[in-house]
Amino acid sequence: MLAVGATLCLLSFLTGATGRLAPDDLCYAEPRKTGPMPRSKPKHQPLLFEAPKVALTAESKGCQLILLDPPIDMGYRLEDKINASIAWFFDFGNCRMPIAYREYYDCVGNAIPSPETCDGYSFTLVKTEGVVEFTIVNMSLLLQPGIYDSGSFIYSALLDMDVLTGRVILNVENDTNYPCGMTHGLTADGNINVDETTHTTPHPRAVGCFPELINFDAWENVTFEEMGIPDPNSFLDDESDYPNTMDCYSWDLYTYPKSLKQAEGPQTLLIGAVGLRILAQAWKFVENETYSQHTRTYTRDAKEVDVTQPSPVQADSVLAKKRTSMKNNPIYSEGKPHAKPFSTIDSIHTEGMKNNPVYSESLMLNVQHSDSITTGGVLHGLQDCDNQLKTVYICLALIGLAHVP
């Protein structure tokens, strides 16, 4: 009887869920530089110490912001100080692509390593494609999944001398009938066949994370180095200098991943950078639907609010004809853009923009018709940006605004 009970316990551990909705206080897009600051660059590189032996599952839908948690039990450990590290990878089958890596130093031995429970932590290595899609929160991976993020995420944790390696199989609902579009993800540039479905059944659209609109100059004093974003001057003008999306390696090849960039900002800043990516993406609004509407409802009830879309026919009709006033929106006031006209982009003075991820007059909320979203989302859109656009987020904004009537 004990053997049967032990077997059932083991099976439940191997198939349990380890993904969860991110707490509401992680859904923000302003640049917060609070809490402990990182100490220096990591001393080591992210490694897969062994093949994962634990497989867990996670679910995501709509615009949800989620945390993938490694199942780490610190309760049995002593309080003696330890060093720790966490690496996250995506498993493409024939190779594993590194996504994020961080080291912690002199941590309380029986607490989850974090900037608050450790005496110090390293800069975070993050995979970037001009925007911050992922970051580490303590030992967990934070992201807003698209339908092309379904797949196997691998964690590799080191707690002093103890190695914990496993995989989290993320299942993203392939319904794209949400304001955030959903057509982005790690496999968007590959040959993965995903059905981009728009469900006919009415369901809430305000599902997930809708960061409060921010002042357009909020990120003015944040550098590319703090966010781990390559200076657009270095890769928009020369595509060959930009890391390959599929930079990954097999189990027996431990080469330093070029696609990981060093983000020197604190954990709170990188969380905001993920929120900024959410805010800057191309949005799909239906008639009489606005972003500020979802921001208000999300603030009141961050789980699900009944703002439904009756049918895909209405979704594909036209952008909202009457937009409500969005006084805090750097783009729209009564539906009119504040940004400089496209014809004047060439004359934008860029001398002070070289280390600024968001040009102070051009942080925009992207709005598109639902039929203008293409597979791959912002990753594909970046390839169409003019070389004169020296800021990634102004580039994203123009992609979206180019489709607004």
UniProtKB/Swiss-Prot annotation:
The chain crosses the membrane at residues 389-405. It is found in: Virion membrane. Glycans are attached at N83, N138, N174, N221, N288. The keyword NAD does not apply. InterPro entries: Herpes_glycop_dom, Ig-like_dom_sf. Gene3D superfamilies: 2.70.230.10. Belongs to the alphaherpesvirinae glycoprotein G family. Chemokine-binding protein that inhibits neutrophils' chemotaxis. This is Envelope glycoprotein G. The gene is gG.
